A protein has these predicted regions:
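Positively charged n-region of N-terminal signal peptides that target proteins for export
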Residues: 1-4
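Extracytoplasmic
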Residues: 37-39, 55, 63, 69-72, ...
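Exposed beta-sheet edge and beta->alpha loop/turn motif
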Residues: 42, 127-195, 200
Length: 213
């Protein structure tokens, strides 16, 4: 489920075909504009690079660092995924946790980028925005097979001072992904401590076939 869900996130970020309004600065950009801007940039990169379409790790890492990481509050996402035990982690352990969470997502992204040539995304109504946090609802569908059911996704974003909107979680068909990881990581950290969680995360990065089961 998590693999499918993160593939959908990649699709949603990368596959929008909606035209953007005039460029806006981070401070004036709406959350909808932000999602569409990032999506178009990633879609363009994937269309131009066969290595990305094939899921080659170095190409995916470059895409993540250049396009995806600036679009998310990754420290907050990692902290949310780890749960209460994050407060007990040393600075060095926190760096390790962020690195391993990034590697985990890259492995999943690699399996979903080939979808980019056959998808489109639309903004759905009933979004929310109080100026500090926002909800952006989207629907992803196949271009070649429009009869396939639309996959609905919900972005949760936070407006960070001097940086603008950043993604902090994504809901794919009812599942909040960071919260889903929190259930896994939180249980491991509670039983085995932060070092135990780091070992488990490292093992899954080293042996991704285990994580797919």
């Amino acid at each position: 489920m998590l693999r499918r869900a993160f593939m959908a996130i990649v699709g949603c970020l990368a596959l929008t075909c909606v035209a953007l309004p005039a460029a806006s600065s981070p401070s004036t950009q709406s959350p909808e504009e932000f999602v569409l801007k990032v999506s178009n940039e990633i879609l363009d990169a994937i269309k131009k690079d066969p290595k990305l379409q094939q899921g080659e790790k170095k190409a995916v890492e470059a895409l993540v660092d250049e396009k995806m990481m600036p679009a998310v509050d990754f420290l907050r996402m990692t902290r949310m995924a780890v749960g209460p035990k994050w407060r007990e982690a040393t600075p060095e352990q926190r760096e390790q946790l962020q690195h391993l969470f990034r590697e985990t997502l890259i492995q999943v992204y690699s399996g979903g980028l080939s979808m980019a040539k056959d998808q489109k995304v639309r903004i759905l109504p009933r979004g929310q925005n109080d100026g500090t946090e926002a909800i952006v609802r989207t629907g992803m569908s196949s271009i070649s097979d429009p009869g396939k059911p639309e996959v609905q996704m919900v972005y949760r974003l936070r407006n960070i001072k001097d940086q603008g909107w950043k993604v902090i979680d994504v809901n794919v068909e009812g599942v909040w992904l960071v919260s889903n990881y929190r259930n896994q990581y939180g249980n491991i950290a509670a039983q085995e401590g932060i070092e135990g969680l780091i070992r488990r995360m490292q093992d899954r990065v080293d042996h991704p076939e285990t994580a797919k089961k």
